[in-house]
Amino acid sequence: MTPPPPKRQKRDEYRKATAEAASQPGPSDVAEIKLPKKKYYRQRAHANPFSDHHLNYPLSPAHMDWSSHYPAFVDPDPSHTNLAGARKLLKDVEVVDIGCGFGGLLIGLAPLLPESLIVGMEIRVSVLEYVTTRIQALRAQQLKLRAATAAATAASETPSQQQAQIDGKQANANAAADAASPVLSTDTEHTPTTLVPGSYENISAIRSNTMKFFPNFFARHQLSKIFICFPDPHFKARKHKARIISETLNAEYAYALRPGGLLYTITDVEEYHHWILRHFGVESGAEEESEEKSTSANANANANAGVRELFERVSEEELEKDECVRVMKEATEEGKKVARNKGNKYVAVFRRKTDPEWPA
């Protein structure tokens, strides 16, 4: 049997060693806990959402086991289990990043929303493995920092040490405030030196095909925020059916999003931005593409009319005050690449309206 190429062997060995180091209570020095490197997690840019991937998904949201993803939020009462027999959490997942990629948005939102459970959904295997390993390493680093901080606090006895402790606490508080700001460094080679709110215990990632199984994970009105950042534009007309924004999927997002919840979108493709606006009923007068039939256009118009009753676009004034928008622009890997290339970023955020009343 022919062995795999040397590069593949090197990648597999690195990924295995990195995953083991991140998941085990290893070195005492924070600097020794390394974050994974992207070059060892090669993955194609696309995955066909219509293929029958080997995926694990719950029968319903009540069957989903979140305990392994958020161990710090597991209900201490072992008798509190869901329909699948898994331990329940103290709170529900309420923020979702659809197509989380390499996890830049998750890392940026973690200290900004320390009391909210955030999950990223990704269909590509290697990318998900990278994100999972990255989160485990960040949690391990925070654990070591907490232990080092506690030891330093206990060791301070003399007045000079107490004064140094006070100064150190003030410095840590300022650093933590900086860490909680939305402009975060997501360089995988960076080793944090301060504690961040939440210690990255509130983020995780799962492998899932959102186009098929989104309602299997989230109950009605469970979510407060949905992020769709730099989705695959699928430029060819015959590929438009694979876009993550459509009438059908928008209805599923509205089902899981609670009234007042926000759906964030950002793209660097202007045509796709207008597609998003049309499918949320904002650009109702836009002409459909020439190759589409009139019957399909009429059906889309009717669907958009229904979406218009469920979503309203958030004004630019509100977006300027929303810290999540800043993170979405600056913390994601695609956002950084667009900034390096001096490209444009098109943002549209939609608020979930209250469900319309049934006619009498």
Swiss-Prot record:
It is found in: Nucleus. Residues 1-32, 177-196 are annotated as: Disordered. The active site is at 232. One of its GO terms (cellular component) is nucleus. It is an enzyme of class 2 (transferase). The keyword Methyltransferase applies. Its EC number is 2.1.1.33. Pathway: tRNA modification; N(7)-methylguanine-tRNA biosynthesis. Disulfide bonds: none annotated. Residues 183-196 have a biased composition (Polar residues). SUPFAM superfamilies: S-adenosyl-L-methionine-dependent methyltransferases (SSF53335). Keywords: Methyltransferase, Nucleus, RNA-binding, S-adenosyl-L-methionine, Transferase, tRNA processing, tRNA-binding. It holds the Pfam family Methyltransf_4. S-adenosyl-L-methionine binds at residues 99, 122-123, 209-210, 229, 332-334. It catalyses: guanosine(46) in tRNA + S-adenosyl-L-methionine = N(7)-methylguanosine(46) in tRNA + S-adenosyl-L-homocysteine. GO terms for molecular function: tRNA (guanine(46)-N7)-methyltransferase activity; tRNA binding. It comes from the Eukaryota. Belongs to the class I-like SAM-binding methyltransferase superfamily. TrmB family. Forms a complex with trm82. HAMAP family: tRNA_methyltr_TrmB_euk. Catalyzes the formation of N(7)-methylguanine at position 46 (m7G46) in tRNA. PANTHER family: 3-DEOXY-D-MANNO-OCTULOSONIC-ACID TRANSFERASE/TRNA GUANINE-N 7 - -METHYLTRANSFERASE (PTHR23417), TRNA (GUANINE-N(7)-)-METHYLTRANSFERASE (PTHR23417:SF16). This is tRNA (guanine-N(7)-)-methyltransferase. It comes from Neosartorya fischeri (strain ATCC 1020 / DSM 3700 / CBS 544.65 / FGSC A1164 / JCM 1740 / NRRL 181 / WB 181). The lineage of its organism: Eukaryota, Fungi, Dikarya, Ascomycota, Pezizomycotina.
